[in-house]
Amino acid sequence: MILVLDVGNTNIVLGVYDDRELISVWRLSTDSKRTADEYGVQVIDLFLQSKLKPEDITGSIISSVVPTIMYSLEHMIIKYFQVSPIIVGPGVKTGINVKYDNPREVGADRIVNAVAAHEIYNRSLIIIDFGTATTFCAVTSAGDYLGGAICPGIKISSSALFEMAAKLPRVEIIRPQNIIGKNTVSSMQSGIVYGYIGQVDYIVKKMKMEMMDLGEEEPLVIATGGLAKLINEGTKSIDIIDSVLTLTGLRLIYEKNKE
């Protein structure tokens, strides 16, 4: 079995694979102040609750966009699972040809998603990840990572309204039935959610045009991340939602790099 970790700005998603089967998924808060032992105790407890044996873990891989937490997580895995994790970054085999001006600038999570989507669908792709930031990534049928777009996440946008506008309240992020709000809360929800849906539709439309101008077939649009289902309810731009796309990518990269 292998332990995979997708470390985001807000949450750490952990998955356990038995061969190619994902048998457990957990979500922890990202906290750079926590020690290896604090994370270790929590992860071991999750294993025991799921009736899994830590000693059955034979390998691990981490993708992270939070450098300050890596020391704790890497040493947690070494100490509590007796394996040295693969860290997704320069020098790790992915099978993806990154066409960015500076390939080192591309977030590990974006590469991991590209690996999974390319392996599964093997065609032109646009990958949307609704996380703390929302990312759009363009991948060709040959596996070239062309680049993409990075936007503030929905929760960041909502928090900014509350924090920067004195009279606006904090609101739950839900899609209101009507776009014309009848009160402050529904008006904010309309602007946040429908504004985001419009953003998705426009960026996907323009990315498709640019990719097809390069000779690619019309891309398939894959979405992942916690708010993908909410946005998908109001758009026809998304073809497939894959909630474990990043974990799948981590497993695939592990298989490409295991000794």
UniProtKB/Swiss-Prot annotation:
A monovalent cation. Ammonium or potassium. ATP binds at D6, V7, G8, N9, T10, N11, I12, V13, T132. Substrate binds at Y100, G107, A108, D109, R110, T184. It is an enzyme of class 2 (transferase). Pathway: Cofactor biosynthesis; coenzyme A biosynthesis; CoA from (R)-pantothenate: step 1/5. The keyword ATP-binding applies. CDD domains: ASKHA_NBD_PanK-III. Pfam families: Pan_kinase (PF03309). GO terms for biological process: coenzyme A biosynthetic process. The active site is at D109 (proton acceptor). One of its GO terms (molecular function) is ATP binding. Keywords: ATP-binding, Coenzyme A biosynthesis, Cytoplasm, Kinase, Metal-binding, Nucleotide-binding, Potassium, Transferase. The keyword Kinase applies. It catalyses: (R)-pantothenate + ATP = (R)-4'-phosphopantothenate + ADP + H(+). Its EC number is 2.7.1.33. It is found in: Cytoplasm. K(+) binds at D129. Its cofactor is NH4(+); K(+). Belongs to the type III pantothenate kinase family. Homodimer. This is Type III pantothenate kinase. It comes from Clostridium kluyveri (strain ATCC 8527 / DSM 555 / NBRC 12016 / NCIMB 10680 / K1). The lineage of its organism: Bacteria, Bacillati, Bacillota, Clostridia, Eubacteriales. The gene is coaX.
